[in-house]
């Protein structure tokens, strides 16, 4: 499974990657995880390199996670997008 993670906070990015690696190991799965600290970089890469699932921070500079998801949806309508944030304004 190819997974893209995008978060401008490197500590959070590494934490998510580590949790996914632990999960993959526990389940006997193989994950290819690519990390991005720039939403613009992921937007330009994802059009040519498809991922099975996207984990996106909501609040990022230049392009937020919501607009990044819109960019991704323009060429990938089916891969799941999971939004992540530590901001209480988006809490459910």
Regions found by a protein language model. Name each.
Residues 35-53:
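Acidic, metal-coordinating helix/loop segments flanking the phosphotransfer/catalytic sites
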Residues 24, 43-45, 71-72:
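Short, flexible, glycine/charge-rich loop motifs used to bind or transfer phosphoryl groups or to couple energy/partner
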Residues 1-2:
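Non-catalytic signal-transmission and effector/linker regions of two-component phosphorelay proteins
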Residues 51-92:
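CheY-like receiver
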Residues 14, 44, 92:
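Alpha-helical elements of the RecA-like P-loop NTPase motor core of helicases
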Residues 7:
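Conserved acidic carboxylate
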Residues 10-34:
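Two-component/phosphorelay signaling modules centered on CheY-like receiver
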